Amino acid sequence: MEHADADRTRVAPEIGSLHDEDAEADPARAREMERLQPWREQVTARGVVAAALIGFVFSVIVMKIALTTGLVPTLNISAALLAFLALRGWTRALERLGFSPRPFTRQENTVVQTCAVACYTIAFGGGFGSTLLGLNKRTYELAGNSPGNVPGSYKEPGIGWMVGLLLAISFAGNLSLIPLRKALVVDYKLTYPSGTATAVLINGFHTAQGDKNAKLQLHGFLKYFGLSLFWSFFQWFYTGGNACGFVQFPTFGLKAWKQSFFFDFSLTYVGAGMICSHLVNLSTLLGAVISWGIMWPLISKHKGDWYPANIPESSMTSLYGYKSFLCIALIMGDGLYHFVKVTGVTAKSLHNRFNRKSVSNTASEEGDMVSLDDLQRDEVFKRGTVPSWMAYSGYFLLSIIAVITIPIMFRQVKWYYVIIAYALGPVLGFANSYGAGLTDINMGYNYGKIALFVFAAWAGKDNGVIAGLVVGTLVKQLVLVSADLMHDLKTGHLTLTSPRSMLVGELIGTGIGCFIAPLTFMLFYRAFDIGNPDGYWKAPYALIYRNMAILGIEGISALPKHCLSLSVGFFAFAVLTNVARDALPARYKKLVPLPTAMAVPFLVGASFAIDMCVGSLVLFAWNKMNKKEAAFMVPAVASGLMCGDGIWTFPSSILALAKIKPPICMKFTPGS
């Protein structure tokens, strides 16, 4: 967002009007607001069970995405929808059986959504498709024999150490900013657009109109869930070999198929394309055309000149090196620009606040605009306080545990690296959370990349790769989770949910995720060929992050011939596109591509970009035919497509472990 203050004033009236409309449409809402449940009653056993099930399903989905392309869409809206459908369906079923279940409130809905999101966030935020997988032997071998990639600098995945690492690093971020939650949410009135959007959705569910829509949404979800599950099951029968089945269907001909331009019938990515914006989807397609349609064929013509002809193309000193480092250049250019931008916006906003003439003047200026609803939300938010001493004590205790355990797991990580990371955590977390409240951009991954570079360079050649990957994961988790919690607290603020119940839901979800994510990952890791650059499970970000660590150790000497010049060009392109997006009028912004979205196909191929664009096409057509219906049905249908295809991965992995192979291999060859 280019003008955070303008966005804030735009969003707030919309929320207020929606609340007013809700109150008019549902008179019972006013009575419900007067008798809010105590925070302990907002965290229910049925809610935790529902959150665990939703978290498991979404963990499987995002794990599949993280291990194939790495471009994971935001599923918070889908989580809120499924939480509502599950618990509303449960209470209705009990009522029909003659029972009198406790009412299902928007506060319980909010806690369940928070718990489920915290659970599945571990599946992609924990680094299973990036930093943690970058530690394994296959990624070490793919990175090649460079000086920074020293022999033995790998650690094979294991449930024990992965669960231990996640338990050591995933909770502290939830506590670091608890004492500042009132300042960020109430005093500064930060928008946190994603949290606000989720709150508006949940408030809309718990109205008379929302109840009517829920029946249609449930029907749509179940219909497309069943369709997606059956299609995935049907496809499985034709994948009995290498490069077989509908996932290798040469939609645009065999020449295009060789350059990965084909539709692979992945309903997971069709659903993701319906959730992501048209700009994201078209950016991935543009990246696919530039890389697989233009760049890689041109670079391949210099085989034997730019890189040796007698080594496989999957080697880092071959074509794959160009793919990897040009992808990194786009991601780093995009990330650095946003880092500078958000830091500048944050500093400017804080400077303006601290230079106000007096608090009393500000209060008198804004006091007239405060509604009774706002006062009640603020009162509920302040009343559900969590003692600062408890948050500080918890953070300190978790820091001590991490300082002791992480160096035991990884001898390359010195204890003082961990102390520095935890000391910086609250400072970086506040800057990131404040920026996310203004811009809706969570910079946790960028802080993690910077930490990866710094600690890899600091640790040196022998220890740098593992130290950089592990400490980068630690910093990313500390910063990422604190901003996610503030988004959730904003949702709770607007749904009159106690901060205590929100924090409890967040901690429960995180704890569940610390076990579900490693178990799901290890199931996939043992059943499928994870990390094969020529296979389906490419896991591109594992090699990207390992190469970042090597780059931090070696500098530009790690790059293949002419790769530096190309990387500088792509880095500059990423920066300039962002400058153009912020400088151009609003109507032209949609024409400027997103560099990070463009970068993903560089390694994983064009097929997933085509899947995403099919999802965009479905959304576009639906909006043209019936925009009102599409507004509330698209999240349900997209969730059904993603859940059905994603859940099939679970039984298919069990079949693979049991050595049960599909009976048919469907391939396509040129005609005679």
UniProtKB/Swiss-Prot annotation:
What tissue specificity does the UniProt entry give?
Expressed in root phloem and at low levels in the shoot companion cells.
Induction field: In roots by iron deficiency.
Q: Where is the composition biased (Basic and acidic residues)?
A: 1-11
For this record, the Gene Ontology CC terms, alphabetical, are:
plasma membrane
**Quick one: where's region Disordered?**
1-27
Record-level GO BP terms: response to iron ion; seed development
Is Disulfide bond found in the keyword set? no
Location relative to the cell: Cell membrane
Give the Gene Ontology MF terms in alphabetical order: iron-nicotianamine transmembrane transporter activity; oligopeptide transmembrane transporter activity
Give the family from UniProt.
Answer: Belongs to the YSL (TC 2.A.67.2) family.
UniProt function note: Involved in Fe(3+) uptake from the rhizosphere and phloem transport of iron. Plays an important role in iron homeostasis during the early stages of growth. Transports Fe(3+)-phytosiderophore, but not Fe(3+)- or Fe(2+)-nicotianamine. May not transport other chelated metals.
User: Do you know which PANTHER family this protein is assigned to?
Assistant: IRON-PHYTOSIDEROPHORE TRANSPORTER YSL15, OLIGOPEPTIDE TRANSPORTER YGL114W-RELATED
Q: What is this protein called?
A: Iron-phytosiderophore transporter YSL15
Can you name the source organism?
Answer: Oryza sativa subsp. japonica
